[in-house]
Swiss-Prot record:
Enzyme class: translocase
Organism: Nitrosococcus oceani (strain ATCC 19707 / BCRC 17464 / JCM 30415 / NCIMB 11848 / C-107)
GO molecular function: ATP binding; proton-transporting ATP synthase activity, rotational mechanism; proton-transporting ATPase activity, rotational mechanism
Stated role: Produces ATP from ADP in the presence of a proton gradient across the membrane. The V-type alpha chain is a catalytic subunit.
Record carries keyword Signal: no
Protein name per Swiss-Prot or TrEMBL: V-type ATP synthase alpha chain
Family: Belongs to the ATPase alpha/beta chains family.
EC number(s) per entry: 7.1.2.2
Binding site for ATP: G232, P233, F234, G235, A236, G237, K238, T239
Reactions the enzyme catalyzes: ATP + H2O + 4 H(+)(in) = ADP + phosphate + 5 H(+)(out)
Keyword flag Transport: yes
Length: 591
């Protein structure tokens, strides 16, 4: 026990000897949750994850004997937690629409009964170590929750519970730890959020995370286990892009962390996700989704904890052998929380008031992504996608610039594209992906070997069109040759028929990889056939007037993912239309 000495917003000072950094504490008569972040002699600096209004010096501070941690076990999926893993559904039942300060509710429902199936390969007397699977629980109809020996524990298995129904607190196994010590294991365990969960070794990424968004999958792919950033100014569509990724990505588990964003955006997520169907299983999307909601009107330092809570939950499912994608919206709000705490601590600010350790904290967070061989021998991955909200869209500000140096995939959102109603507003000029060589091998093996060449040609066409657009803006389209005008038309086809994608269109919202490549190939075929006719002397006006061009723009929404073969038949119609135009001019003597 200790005594509170000073209250400075979310930061308090207490006389609390012999309590290490990182330890979780309870503050005052309300029992507010806090964490020790520094020491000065016998005094501890504590950041408080709840509002400190009415808290006064002299109140008691209780050290809980463990760091800020989360409870890991069956029952996580489908839940909505706040920034310190309190379930919002049960908080609503306990305290109403406003979360009462100091309310204590465990992250997992303790009374719920789970059907446990022991691992048939284990028996009493066998040596087990951290990460070994003791058995499984059907958490949802599509996800099997594997019960693991917590990392750091090892010993001889004394007993393993038979198949049956158990609560989270029931003992399902006992380990002989040596020195006449035994350890009881239950369906759940706790893990400190700031400590990355261990693994055997890192593995190279081998397959892309397919999001169903054409500009991301086809032009700037991200590998499973990779790290990506989505920077963009206000109104550019960051939240919508991240929600689309969370909805449609081919990961096994999706964790959406709303960190300091507006409450109405998170309400939209909470309202829409339960009604969506997972395209990969046909079941409810919430059966593989976990939400951490920490809105802008919640205590600022809780934003900092919410990202660590989200990534720890992701690592837990990774250790079970699953591919996890974590969507963090947004890391800028997290960095602002660091700035506020650093300012109250009196630390020397650097760029734009951020603390000097901003870059190292960002790097440490993103380093928790990766594809790994787990302690249990399986392979799992955590893919981290963080939104960045640079003020005024300035990508040179500290959070964006440091993030750009860390990530391997950068999906830069453009205000100009958003203003032109081009969504997703991902800029093909400023975005990049370092994962293209590996992704190309996957596309060649599973879809088509010409993917990389087609992508490169489309990017070249878009770049050429950008240069020609500057000329058009200065002197008008009449200054361009027929070939140059056709380059502009080819780039427009790619933009409107491939890159633009409606999240509200039930057909176009998700695009399968097979359809993505056929659409890319279709646009390039139109361009190639037009170039051939131009070389034969056909006027560019004749090409621009072909009805198939308008139909090609609509293919993305006219053909479902199951109609790829029908879409391929349309390419034959295009060849016939261009061939017919060439023959007409030849017969008329115009060529």
């Amino acid at each position: 026990m200790g005594k509170l000495l000073e209250v400075n917003g979310p930061l308090v000072r207490a006389r609390l000897p012999q309590v290490p950094n990182g330890e979780q504490v309870r503050i005052g008569t309300l029992g507010l949750v806090g964490e020790v972040i520094g020491r000065e002699g016998q005094e501890a600096l504590i950041q408080v994850y709840e509002g400190t209004e009415s808290v006064r010096p002299g109140e008691e501070v209780e050290a809980l004997g463990h760091p800020l941690s989360v409870e890991l076990g069956p029952g996580l999926l489908g839940q909505v937690f706040d920034g310190i893993q309190r379930p919002l559904g049960r908080l609503l039942e306990a305290s109403g629409d406003r979360i009462s300060r100091g309310i204590q509710i465990q992250g997992l429902e303790q009374a719920r009964v789970w059907r446990f199936q022991p691992n048939p390969q284990l028996a009493a007397g066998m040596a087990v170590t951290g990460g070994v699977c003791l058995g499984a629980v059907p958490e949802t109809p599509t996800i099997e929750h594997r019960i693991l020996v917590p990392p750091g524990l090892s010993g001889e298995l004394l007993e393993l519970a038979p198949e049956g129904e158990y609560r989270l607190s029931d003992v399902i196994a006992r380990l002989d730890m040596g020195d006449h010590r035994s350890q009881a294991l239950t369906l759940s365990h706790r893990w400190p959020v700031r400590n990355p969960r261990p693994y055997q070794q890192r593995e190279h990424g081998v397959s892309p995370l397919m999001t169903g968004q054409r500009i991301l999958d086809t032009f700037f792919p991200l590998l499973k286990g990779g790290k990506a950033a989505v920077p963009g100014p206000f109104g550019a569509g960051k939240t919508m892009v991240q929600q689309q990724i969370a909805r449609w990505s081919n990961a096994d588990i999706v964790i959406y962390v709303g960190c300091g964003e507006r409450g109405n955006e998170l309400v939209e997520v909470l309202d829409s996700f339960p009604e969506l169907t997972d395209p990969h299983t046909g079941r409810s999307l919430m059966e593989r989704t976990l939400l951490v909601a920490n809105t802008s009107n919640m205590p600022v330092v809780a934003r900092e904890a919410s990202l660590y809570v989200g990534v720890t939950l992701g690592e837990y499912y990774r250790d079970q052998g699953y591919d996890v994608v974590i969507v963090a919206d947004s890391t800028s709000r997290w960095a602002e929380a660091l700035r506020e705490v650093a300012g109250r601590l009196g630390q020397m600010p650097v760029e734009e008031g951020y603390p000097a350790y901003l870059a190292s904290r960002l790097a440490a967070f993103y380093e928790r992504a990766g594809r790994v061989q787990t302690l249990g021998g399986s392979v799992g991955s955590v893919t981290l996608i963080g939104a960045v909200s640079p003020p005024g869209g300035d990508f040179s500000e500290p959070v964006t610039s440091h993030t750009k140096e860390i990530v391997r995939t950068f999906w830069a959102l453009s205000k100009d594209l958003a203003d032109a109603r081009h969504y997703p507003a991902v800029s093909w000029r400023e975005s990049f992906s370092d994962d293209i060589p590996v992704a190309a091998r996957w596309w060649a093996e599973h879809i088509d070997k010409h993917w990389q060449a087609g992508r490169a040609e489309a990017m070249t066409l878009l770049t050429q069109a950008e240069e020609l657009s500057r000329i058009v803006n200065l002197v008008g389209p009449e200054a361009l040759s027929g070939t140059q005008r056709w380059i502009l038309e080819g780039a427009t086809l790619i933009k409107e028929g491939l890159l633009q994608q409606s999240a509200l269109d039930p057909v176009d919202s998700f695009c399968a990889p097979e359809k993505q490549f056929v659409l890319l190939d279709l646009m390039l075929q139109i361009y190639h056939q037009g170039v051939e006719l131009l070389e034969q002397g056909v006027p560019v006006q004749e090409l621009l007037g072909l009805p198939v061009l308008a139909r090609a723009r609509r293919c993305k929404s006219d053909y479902k993912n199951t109609q790829v073969e029908t879409l391929q038949d349309f390419t034959k119609e295009i060849k016939e239309a261009f061939g017919r135009l060439g023959r007409e001019h030849a017969e008329a003597g115009k060529i």
